[in-house]
Amino acid sequence: MIILAIESSCDETGVGIAELSEDGTVTLLADEVASSVDEHARFGGVVPEIASRAHLEALGPTMRRALDTAGVGRPDVVAATIGPGLAGALLVGVAAAKAYSAAWQVPFYGVNHLGGHLAADVYDHGPLPESVGLLVSGGHTHLLHVRSLGEPIIELGSTVDDAAGEAYDKVARLLGLGYPGGKVLDDLARQGDREAIVFPRGMTGPRDDPFAFSFSGLKTAVARYVESHPEASQADVAAGFQEAVADVLTRKAVRAAETLGVSTLLIAGGVAANSRLRELAEQRCAESGLTLRIPRPRLCTDNGAMIASFAAHLIAAGAPPSPLEAASDPGLPVVRSQVA
């Protein structure tokens, strides 16, 4: 079965094509992405209207490249991110997917963007066993219990304020590093001393929810430090901030796996591309006897391949198609795998 999937939840226009075999194996055939990030950079963040217009302009050419790369003329299924995300951006991808579904007379699946991030790892490491999932991106930070990708995902905890990726962008802006902040702040942090400045670790007290996160206080602490120490090394500030984020994320994720008695930790989402998060997660999983799974950096960021993978797993589990009347949902919760 050939599955074509469209991703348009934010500022990347992605088209992925995957093949679902009879034994449940999912093979990636094409992964084409067009980004409008440069158009948003001068505004210091994603502008929804610009993102929607960019999707309209990029979707056709991106679709053509994906079909050519895969050598596919007509897929058996069309899927799309139906939420969560920017309302206008979602509408572009969902409307296009429905149109292709109707034209090709094939089923349509509207699936969850967040589940897609988890499913991306299958391309690199094969079938996913029962896992604790740490999903970290620009707009989301969740700890999840993933029994299988075809079953409902269970949320263990999430951020009570800023997402980890959002904190990265805000601190990068504070340091004058521009947008998007994740990659440039990571690069700067590698030049600094992560022990030179110790920033607070939110929600790590004995009375705090062990599976909840908070990064607002950390962001404020960095701002106050920079204001009171104008001579401080930006690299040290970046390294101290990054260490605080990676420490909390990995500490809570490992604890969740140990609490549930699950032997695999999956880290996914855009922030999973961060070098220190990957390094510290590997170290702590080795110490705890856990198997760590993280997709290659390209599959951590938004793409259509991850949506194709998630749709494939839902189909393999017997999920019904979504009606063409299904509406996109900008606030779709992680526990809803699809809109059916």
Curated annotation (Swiss-Prot):
It is found in: Cytoplasm. Binds 1 Fe(2+) ion per subunit. Transmembrane segments: none annotated. Its EC number is 2.3.1.234. The keyword Phosphoprotein does not apply. SUPFAM superfamilies: Actin-like ATPase domain. It catalyses: L-threonylcarbamoyladenylate + adenosine(37) in tRNA = N(6)-L-threonylcarbamoyladenosine(37) in tRNA + AMP + H(+). It holds the Pfam family TsaD. The keyword Transmembrane helix does not apply. GO terms for cellular component: cytoplasm. One of its GO terms (biological process) is tRNA threonylcarbamoyladenosine modification. It comes from the Bacteria. It is an enzyme of class 2 (transferase). Keywords: Acyltransferase, Cytoplasm, Iron, Metal-binding, Transferase, tRNA processing. One of its GO terms (molecular function) is iron ion binding. Fe cation binds at H113, H117, D302. InterPro entries: ATPase_NBD, Gcp-like_dom, KAE1/TsaD, Peptidase_M22_CS, TsaD. Substrate binds at L135, V136, S137, G138, G139, D169, G182, D186, N274. Its cofactor is Fe(2+). CDD domains: ASKHA_NBD_TsaD_bac (cd24133). Required for the formation of a threonylcarbamoyl group on adenosine at position 37 (t(6)A37) in tRNAs that read codons beginning with adenine. Is involved in the transfer of the threonylcarbamoyl moiety of threonylcarbamoyl-AMP (TC-AMP) to the N6 group of A37, together with TsaE and TsaB. TsaD likely plays a direct catalytic role in this reaction. NCBIfam families: gcp_kae1, T6A_TsaD_YgjD. Belongs to the KAE1 / TsaD family. This is tRNA N6-adenosine threonylcarbamoyltransferase. The lineage of its organism: Bacteria, Bacillati, Actinomycetota, Actinomycetes, Mycobacteriales.
